[in-house]
Curated annotation (Swiss-Prot):
Gene3D superfamilies reported in the protein's UniProt record: UbiA prenyltransferase (1.10.357.140)
A GO CC term attached to the entry: plasma membrane
Entry-linked InterPro entries: Protohaem_IX_farnesylTrfase, UbiA_prenyltransferase, UbiA_prenylTrfase_CS, UbiA_sf
Native source organism of the sequence: Pseudoalteromonas atlantica (strain T6c / ATCC BAA-1087)
Reactions accelerated catalytically: heme b + (2E,6E)-farnesyl diphosphate + H2O = Fe(II)-heme o + diphosphate
Name under which the protein is recorded: Protoheme IX farnesyltransferase 2
CDD domains: PT_UbiA_Cox10 (cd13957)
EC number: 2.5.1.141
A GO biological-process term: heme O biosynthetic process
Amino acid sequence: MSKSVGVAPHNIVNKSGLHWRDYYEMTKPKVVMLLLLTALVGMCLASETWISWKILLAGLTGIGFLSSAAAVINHVVDRKIDAQMARTSNRPMPKGKVSPQRALVFAGVLTVVGYLILELWVNRLTALLTLASLVGYAFIYTMYLKRATPQNIVIGGLAGAAPPLLGWTAVTNDIHAHALLLVLIIFIWTPPHFWALAIHREKDYARAKIPMLPCTHGIEFTKTSILLYTVLLALISVLPYLIGMTGAIYLLGSSALNAGFLYYAWKLKFASDEHTAMKTFKFSIIHLMVLFVVLLVDHYMRFTF
């Protein structure tokens, strides 16, 4: 049964239902927490010693504020699209709980405060790179790429892959190849992650006229693309060990995680049910989260074969 969706008129806000939880929801806290985990790992891997708690706190707070601001802007720009999709129709803006004007003010405050924290207590490089990531996600991806090309996730994924680099520069004030390798891992992880969701929500995206890969090239083509990207991810994930960046704990952990992701991608390729795509999507989140935890454990408990 299809779920009816709709949007409140843009000039009508349900003030009686206005609540801080609506603003909190617009920051996409679960997504931001995963981003901050990858930023934290970037910080830790950048140093052989314990990180200053001031840099740790200021860095994660500033990156978190700017990431949250990007999420809020995404809510504003996508409010009409969100109203047409069952998955997003209950968000605060389609429901008329928060006006675009108030949301933009909220995003502006988060942006200014986040940038100043990074500029004043971390370093300018991190502040500028984090601001660039906000622009890349909230404006280049959300306003243009998402609506323009089925490769939106591939190109726009770079902004979402940046946090490990931001964490690294927060500690070192320098861009290092090891940090870029962490970015590359997330960059390659992003397409199969989102395409699995896009398969599950293909009708939603088609209704909203968003050119996601399943809508433009078909579900079978998308399944093949997911499998190929997952194979590429498994190969790329070995590089940190091969260049001496990580030890045996990471090699074993990442191999097990990639084997799991490959299992789901292979199963999805030949599945005809409606649930495998969502299972693949959910596992991809676990994959990235645990992969970066394994990186952290390996860094502080290093041993090699």
